[in-house]
Amino acid sequence: MQKKIIVLALISAFAAPAAFADTEKAELEKLRAMVQELDQKIRTLEHKLESKTAAPAQANANANTNTNTAASAPATTASGITFYGRVNADFESVKNDKVSAVTTAKSVNRVQSNASRFGLKGSEGLGDDLAAIWQLEIQVDPANGGGTPFNGTRNSNVGLKGGFGTVFVGTWDTPYKLAHNKLELFDNASIFSATNLIGRTGANNAANTLVTAVNYNTRQSSVLQYWSPNLSGFQGMIAYSPDSGQTTTQNKSKLSLSGTYENDMLYGALAYENRPDQTTAAVDDHATRLVGAYKFGGGLIGMAYERLSVGTAAATTESQSNLELAGNYKLGNSNLGAFYVKNGNLGARANTGADMYTLRYGYNFSKHTELYGAYTRLSNDASANYSTLTATAIGTVGAASTNGSTQTGLGIGMIYLF
């Protein structure tokens, strides 16, 4: 800023004589315009430098989980606040061959928003390699014409980042969930996502109701998280969410942690989550996940294996194993992706598993815009009731799927990043 004042003073001094020729006046105006332009560039570079030195490690979690979509640089204001967002909507034809209400259509066409969002984030350097960080992100629904377009809090936090790592409080994806993101082809809120099976247990539908279905792909509210610095590719994360309604007999707090390693060719993650007293006091729900991926050129192939255990109303524990194979490849502007997930039986109860696969093709028109198409199929065993269609059958309230259903979906949509 001092340099700007000096330059303007020099220009003014030379401009003191009253009778300038027209050409000299024009030259003076050009110089003043150049100074203003240079000053704006200096401000922009200063904010970029501050963002690089003080940006939170949360950038990895903010990244689009669809690894096929081209990256887009978010907009940064002069005050250092970054605006960013994603609009993802598609036209779908979905089918469920078994629904619980005879008046419910087994197939429908619909328009869906898939975790579209808008966010603000920023940081402030506090000196001594310390920075304050914050983020506010909400989910929006451009397909919802009958209600509010704003329908939920996404990853939002406030905290500190420094040489010690990153610590924050707020609402955020658990380390267990984040460990899987490297393989995810879609946002979790989509009929095409692998998280309709991976990370989930089935309810025990084999002649009793001791077990409630559990989902470990969670964005945890009221959470305290710590992320270690990245040490030559290694990073640890830990999250703790207290139980504000704790009683003398039950404490439903949640603990989630992970260790990851990543370089130009490999990605590996080991994650664990524990949820005590969820169904019955003194019985824990817990999950362990192992993820590995190999990166090559424009592609990635990977696998996830997990062991999930849930408490029952009889104060026992039942477990199941899930497996996922996934891959994606970028060829020019085209993006190809596919995955297969197999969920095992719950405990010793037969026919409580399911499998699912999805095929995806996308085309990047620019770094902001992708057009995509996808097909998915989920097949339940005779006593299982997993669903890509949430708790209701293809959007019809009150008409849930029944055991043993097969669900399919075909869609074409567009993603715009800003």
Regions found by a protein language model. Give the residues of each.
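N-terminal periplasmic/intermembrane-space "pro-region" immediately following the signal or transit peptide
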Residues: 3-86
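Outer membrane beta-barrel
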Residues: 74-95, 105-245, 251-253, 260-267, ...
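Transmembrane beta-strands of outer-membrane beta-barrel proteins
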Residues: 81-89, 128, 132-136, 167, ...
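Outer-membrane beta-barrel and related beta-rich outer-membrane complex signature
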Residues: 97-99, 146, 179-187, 315, ...
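Extracellular loop and loop/strand-boundary signature of outer-membrane beta-barrel proteins
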Residues: 101-107, 211, 311-314, 344-348, ...
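Structural signature of outer-membrane beta-barrel channels/translocons
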Residues: 121-125, 161-163, 227-232, 260-264, ...
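Detector for outer-membrane/organellar transmembrane beta-barrel domains
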Residues: 250, 255-364, 376-377
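Outer-membrane beta-barrel "beta-signal"
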Residues: 404-418
